Amino acid sequence: MTAQGIYLDNNATTRVDPDVLAEMLPLFTEQFGNPSSMHGFGAAVGGQDRMGAQAGAGAARAAHDSEIVFTSGGTESDNTAILSTLEAYPKKKSIVTSVVEHPAVLALCDYLEKKRGYTVHRIGVDNRGNLDLDAYKRCALGPDVAIVSIMWANNETGTIFPIEELAQLAKAAGAVFHTAVQAVGKIPMNVRHSAVDMLCACGHKLHAPKGVHALYVKRGLRFRPIVRGGHQERSRRAGNGERAGHRRAGGGAHVALMHMTDENTRVKRSRQAGAAILAAVPNCFVTGNPANRLPNTCNVAFEYIEGEAILLLLNEADIAASSGSACTSGSLEPSHVMRAMGVPYTAAHGPTRLSLSRETTEEEIDRVIRVVPGMRTGRSVSPYWSQAAPEGVRPVYS
């Protein structure tokens, strides 16, 4: 618990680890040189960059630190992975993704389809958020596919996709495979012995600073820089990035890796305990695959109440959670993930995501559970008792 209360929105961002912050501070006041400079100040910072890349490579079990490209954030990394591949394979005009991707991928695919003439195959999911593998195998992979961009685990429900199987199928079809973001540091991964070609890791979701992201690019992969200019990042991404963050983004990933087993066991136990009691509240259910999702994520859909009302109730109790993705929380429409899963209209507006971290305590979870019964009051004034379901949302969840 912090001075502001209980923070259960760790899939949106995390608190910077105090040790990470302590190691960053000298890089603002002492080792502040431009790493492109030839003098000692620049060389010292360049060394910090290499250490960050080595730590990031280790967290993903990459073979070489040269496979790590630092960017400004997840959106840039996702855009870079897709646009670089399309430029490297100009004759291929198809893209494969899923209907539950982050807006950073979906919005770009929409643009490429409408403005650039690409064909985009969007693979659906079932009511637990599991990818439709038959559709993926049947219609999505052909010689015209340049890239497959599918998240390792969903940021709203935590449902984990069979990434290695998907990547192997893409590789057999001659397509580049791009994945990750939310799953990094939460579940084991080893890209060295994987068919994954590109992988995104977000520092601020690993108790490292915001504005720092890493894109893994497998050695030997065709890569075309999207941000052009200087020779930084081995000429793959121009511009002087946030150097202190580069060092500690890798450090945050390394710390997450060290704590992964113990943390996941404890966090998963808290999540399961919370989910069991939350599910006992009338007219609510846990979304996503109960047996195969991120250990820190619990998304509960409450029927007959808006997500905003739930978040306000929690906020009054000094509990921070979210309704859907942080990047779309300003929208009044149901989450595209809930719609894709067929969550009924009476509940599609009321999903509440509780995302835990290694700092979350069992006492905090108990406090959340005590607050949840207050949802019943909000239901009594909700308009969703009588509204009809819009097109694309099934009336029942089965």
From Swiss-Prot:
<dbReference type="GO" id="GO:0031071">
    <property type="term" value="F:cysteine desulfurase activity"/>
</dbReference>
<dbReference type="GO" id="GO:0046872">
    <property type="term" value="F:metal ion binding"/>
</dbReference>
<dbReference type="InterPro" id="IPR016454">
    <property type="entry name" value="Cysteine_dSase"/>
</dbReference>
<comment type="function">
    <text>Catalyzes the removal of elemental sulfur atoms from cysteine to produce alanine. Seems to participate in the biosynthesis of the nitrogenase metalloclusters by providing the inorganic sulfur required for the Fe-S core formation.</text>
</comment>
<dbReference type="InterPro" id="IPR000192">
    <property type="entry name" value="Aminotrans_V_dom"/>
</dbReference>
<feature type="active site" description="Cysteine persulfide intermediate">
    <location>
        <position position="327"/>
    </location>
</feature>
<feature type="binding site">
    <location>
        <begin position="202"/>
        <end position="204"/>
    </location>
    <ligand>
        <name>pyridoxal 5'-phosphate</name>
    </ligand>
</feature>
<keyword id="KW-0663">Pyridoxal phosphate</keyword>
<dbReference type="InterPro" id="IPR015422">
    <property type="entry name" value="PyrdxlP-dep_Trfase_small"/>
</dbReference>
<dbReference type="GO" id="GO:0051536">
    <property type="term" value="F:iron-sulfur cluster binding"/>
</dbReference>
<feature type="compositionally biased region" description="Basic and acidic residues">
    <location>
        <begin position="230"/>
        <end position="244"/>
    </location>
</feature>
<feature type="binding site">
    <location>
        <position position="182"/>
    </location>
    <ligand>
        <name>pyridoxal 5'-phosphate</name>
    </ligand>
</feature>
<feature type="binding site">
    <location>
        <begin position="74"/>
        <end position="75"/>
    </location>
    <ligand>
        <name>pyridoxal 5'-phosphate</name>
    </ligand>
</feature>
<dbReference type="Pfam" id="PF00266">
    <property type="entry name" value="Aminotran_5"/>
</dbReference>
<keyword id="KW-0411">Iron-sulfur</keyword>
<protein>
    <recommendedName>
        <fullName>Cysteine desulfurase</fullName>
        <ecNumber>2.8.1.7</ecNumber>
    </recommendedName>
</protein>
<keyword id="KW-0808">Transferase</keyword>
<feature type="region of interest" description="Disordered">
    <location>
        <begin position="230"/>
        <end position="253"/>
    </location>
</feature>
<keyword id="KW-0408">Iron</keyword>
<comment type="subunit">
    <text>Homodimer.</text>
</comment>
<keyword id="KW-0479">Metal-binding</keyword>
<feature type="modified residue" description="N6-(pyridoxal phosphate)lysine">
    <location>
        <position position="205"/>
    </location>
</feature>
<dbReference type="InterPro" id="IPR015421">
    <property type="entry name" value="PyrdxlP-dep_Trfase_major"/>
</dbReference>
<comment type="similarity">
    <text>Belongs to the class-V pyridoxal-phosphate-dependent aminotransferase family. NifS/IscS subfamily.</text>
</comment>
<keyword id="KW-0535">Nitrogen fixation</keyword>
<dbReference type="GO" id="GO:0009399">
    <property type="term" value="P:nitrogen fixation"/>
</dbReference>
<dbReference type="InterPro" id="IPR015424">
    <property type="entry name" value="PyrdxlP-dep_Trfase"/>
</dbReference>
<feature type="binding site">
    <location>
        <position position="155"/>
    </location>
    <ligand>
        <name>pyridoxal 5'-phosphate</name>
    </ligand>
</feature>
<feature type="binding site" description="via persulfide group">
    <location>
        <position position="327"/>
    </location>
    <ligand>
        <name>[2Fe-2S] cluster</name>
    </ligand>
</feature>
